[in-house]
C-alpha cells in the first residue's frame, strides 16, 4: 500500500494541495517532509501527537522527517484556532519549553538509521534577519488582501488581531522556504487549522524559487469523538505526554476507556497495526464488545509508544490490582500513580486506633458509623478487611512508609499520605 493510500485508509488526510503530484513524487523517491510545533508549553498533549504520528508513518516508509521546534514562532504566537491574542512568553520560558519538547520528540522518533529524522529550531535562522530584510525579502511577497482572506486572520477581524500575530503566517512561510532550500523539504504536514499557513509557504517558495518548485501541503482532519466533542481531553483536562503531568497509568486509562464507536478510528489514526489486525479488532468490537479487546490493544500500543515497555507493564499491573482489589503487590510508586485522582487525606505516622483514625481523617462521619462499618466488613486497609475495632494503625501498615489505602464498601477508595 502506497503511503498516501495508507494515510487515506486511516482517515488521516483532510486537504492536499496536489494529490496526484504528491502521490507521484513519493512513488518516485524518498522525500523530506516537515511538521512544526511551537513551544507554548513544556509538554505536548495527545492532540499534538496526530500530525507527528503521520510523520512517523512516513519515516517507517523510508522517508525523511524534519521536526521543527518553533523557538522563533513560539515567541510570537500562532493565531490559528484562537479567538483572542496569546500571552507572550519570555525568551527564558520559551527556551525551557524548547528543551522539554526536544526531549519528548527524541523519545518518539528514531534519530538514526537509514531514515534519519532531523530536529531543527527556527530561531537558528530567524533571529539573524533584521527588520529591513524581513520587509524587503519576505514581506514584499505577501499581499495584504490575501493575508486578510486567510481563515486564521478573517476569523479574528471582529475581535482584533495584533500585527505580531498577523505576521505569523509570513514567519511560517519563511520556515518552509528555508527547509526547502537547505534540507530539500518538499512537503509540509499540519492540522486542519494550518492550511492557510501551509499555502502561504507554498506561495512564497514559488515566488522566490520559481513556479516549477515541487512543493506540497497536506493537512489532517480535526479529530472528533463520536459525541461530537473534540478529541484529546479527559475529565481531568488535557492528556499530556509528560509523565509528571499525566501518569502512564492515567494515560493508559484514557485509551482503555475509549468508546466502542471511536476505538477503530483511533486504532487507524494512532497505531502502527496492520489493516488485517485492525479489521480483526473491528469484528471483536461488533461481536464481543464486553471484552473490550480493541480498547486494551489501543491502550497498550499507545502507552508503549509514548512511555515505553516498562511503564506499560506498570500501568497494566495497577489496572489489574484496582480491578481485583488485590493491591498488596503494588509498590509505593504504583500506588501514587493509581490513586492520584482518589480522595486524599493526610495523617501523621503516630500509632492510632482504627476507629479514631478514620473519624479524625474524615473518612467516617462518627465513631459509631466507623465501628458499624468495621463490624460489617465494609472497611479494608491495603486490600485486607479490617474485622477488629481494636486494630491499631501503624506505619508498618503503610506502603514504604508513605501511603495507606482505605476502601469503604466495594469501590470507595481513599489514599492516606503519611508525613
Curated annotation (Swiss-Prot):
Q: Which InterPro entries match?
A: aa-tRNA-synth_I_CS, aa-tRNA-synth_Ic, Rossmann-like_a/b/a_fold, S4_RNA-bd, S4_RNA-bd_sf, SYY-like_C, Tyr-tRNA-ligase, Tyr-tRNA-ligase_bac-type
EC number(s) reported in the record:
6.1.1.1
The answer to whether UniProt assigns keyword Aminoacyl-tRNA synthetase to this entry is yes
Ordered alphabetically, the record's keywords are:
Aminoacyl-tRNA synthetase, ATP-binding, Cytoplasm, Ligase, Nucleotide-binding, Protein biosynthesis, RNA-binding
* CDD domains in alphabetical order: S4, TyrRS_core
Q: Membrane-spanning residues where?
A: none
One Gene Ontology term, aspect cellular component: cytosol
A GO BP term here is: tyrosyl-tRNA aminoacylation
* Domain of life according to the entry: Bacteria
The scientific name of the source species is Bacillus anthracis
Matches recorded under Gene3D superfamilies: HUPs, RNA-binding S4 domain, Tyrosyl-Transfer RNA Synthetase
Q: Where in the cell is it found?
A: Cytoplasm
Q: What is this protein called?
A: Tyrosine--tRNA ligase 2
Main localization, broad class? cytoplasm
| Domain S4 RNA-binding positions | 352-418
Known function: Catalyzes the attachment of tyrosine to tRNA(Tyr) in a two-step reaction: tyrosine is first activated by ATP to form Tyr-AMP and then transferred to the acceptor end of tRNA(Tyr).
Q: Where is this motif: 'KMSKS' region?
A: 230-234
Binding of ATP, residues: 233
Gene from which this protein is expressed: tyrS2
Q: Does the keyword Oxidoreductase apply?
A: no
What are the recorded GO MF terms, alphabetically?
Answer: ATP binding; RNA binding; tyrosine-tRNA ligase activity
